[in-house]
Amino acid sequence: MKTTQKTLLAAAVAALAAPGTWAQTGPVPTQTLRQTTVTGSTIDDRFGDSTREPTSTVSLSGREIEAQHADNLVQVLKAIPGVTIDTQGGDDLKIKFRGVENQRYMGEKPGVAIVIDGVPVFERTGKVNINLDNIESIKVIKGGASYLFGEDALAGAVIITTKRGATNKGVSVETDVGAYGYQRELARIGRASDNWSGHLQLSQRKADDYHFQSNYKSQALAGNLRWLLNGHSDLTLGLEKEDRFRDKHGTVTGVTQAALDPRGTLGRDYARHFDVDLERVNLTYSNDLSDRTNLLALAYQYRDHTQFWSAPQRFSSTGAPVSSPDAYTTFNDYHQTQRGVKSELRTTTGPMAWMGGVEFKRNEYLNKTHAMVGYRNSPSPMERPTAAGTVFTDDRTGENEQALYGEGQWRLATDWTLTGNLRHDRIELDYDAKPVSGNRNSAIAERKSFDANSARLGLSWSGLANTVLFGNISTGFRAPTVDQLYRGSQSPSGSVANNPDLKTEQAINFEVGMRKTFTLMDREASLQTAVFQIDRKDFILDTNGQYSNGNAAHVARYENIGGARSRGLELALQSSISPAWSWDLAYTYLDSTFTQYDQFLLAQGNPRGTLVGTGACAGPNPNWNNCYQLV
């Protein structure tokens, strides 16, 4: 079956790549190939051209977004097939494409890169906070996109351009109200002249929400200033500062709870009371060195300071039961700083064009957790209580990333364009933890590096009026996290060991599709459809299984357990029935499954050896590290 699928895909791409199959009989007229330009960029979306793009893409303008009066990004992206979103209240969400990571719902990365004004933004939990009031445009790229955006673009990327330019001049005041106490206010002032344009914007959103304890509020200050240095170069400064608060997740789990407890008043979320402070500053330089050559450069800094509660308290320090919805044991304090510079040079030479880029990133993550109250994990008098103020974690993770990437486009014939991309990433991790209670007062210092290559080869044909046929093969990758590599050192009292030998996850995407615009009932309409398959290998998962607990008899660790596959069909149709009314239809057929799943916890024993007691089980909390060894 696997060979047949690849053969059919190769035949489809070969058919698209054969101009002779579309040619008329008789003499072939002389054709002059039009000049082509590279469309790919990790810095600026200005070079996009849907007639030559060999990948499924969807673009939304700021005008389209504002016309929806959406209160979160879910309502904006719901018309795009293949997109699923985990919402956590307000604008805090996790975006997923084509079934990749749909089976996960906690703190894992989503396999989708999020880029705002060229700045790659992400949170440790895989979620992203997006200011809906500061969006000029959104571009969605589906399929492996690491060839441009690097790590974790297994299934695609979302590129957001914030508001800028002379269109924001003047004074604007807006307000919206809605159900469950939803309110939105916005005030903006802008100026523009021949040499510069700029604006400042203050916005606020808040709501009580339908679900219990799911109120949220966000306040944001955003601005953009653009200088025209001369007739062919400009400098753009973008900034955004946002304060967010969100209480519970604003969801219920399963059909039973939805029927019996639709507002989620029973039980307690594992984490709540999120305070998030975000800051983003980016400076972009653009220079048209000639009518065929452009230089782009970007420097940026992105900060995320998040504090929240976790682990509901079950028993007091004396062992008495605790059921208050506000009783939690752990305070989490997380600082994230991302800094980077990158530059791209692109040029055109008739029917050929290319772009070369270089990127340097330095990310730092500081994580500290401590006990908010004194507590016990059980009512047993033998259970040693945890004192208020006990420090569980105090660590730092550093990431150094360097990348070289490029794109080439060749106009093979009048209507045929071949696109190729290559990227190489070098990722260096350094992890340091102070000696605290959570790691049994042992200092930790670990170093690890990974190298990864990504590519895309695509073909597009625009020989029919208002129609583009396209096909591509692209790849994506994800590097192991510090938590997966060194879980045993982070939590030696647990049952998960270190595995510093993990390999990067890989994904390969196959896709064939069509874009078309036409007239439907005297109205302009657009259609896009694609068939796709994403094959993943070296999938990383805890050998205990997903969200399951281990024990001393089974020494678990994260492994490259096997592979997964997502395949399907996407169709999007959009049109209008009047100037004031529009409609859209989005359909997705998706089949996702594990193609290989190496099960380590077999009934006949541990595959790595036999666990033998060491007799060194001292202390109140014995664990596999000091109680057992493999022989």
Regions flagged by a language model, labelled:
Residues 112, 117-143, 223:
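Short acidic/polar hinge/loop motifs at secondary-structure boundaries
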Residues 73-76, 95-96, 112-115, 128, ...:
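N-terminal periplasmic accessory domains that precede
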Residues 34-68, 93-95, 112:
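N-terminal periplasmic "start-of-domain" segments of outer-membrane beta-barrel proteins
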Residues 353, 411-418, 426, 526-535, ...:
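Gram-negative outer-membrane beta-barrel transporters
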Residues 351-355, 359-361, 395-534:
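Structural signature of Gram-negative outer-membrane beta-barrels, strongest in the C-terminal barrel
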Residues 177-206, 211-249, 271-294, 348-350, ...:
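Transmembrane beta-barrel wall of Gram-negative outer-membrane proteins
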Residues 74-119:
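Extracytoplasmic beta-strand/coil segments of soluble accessory domains associated
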Residues 294-312, 462, 468-474, 501-560, ...:
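Membrane-embedded beta-barrel scaffold of Gram-negative outer-membrane proteins
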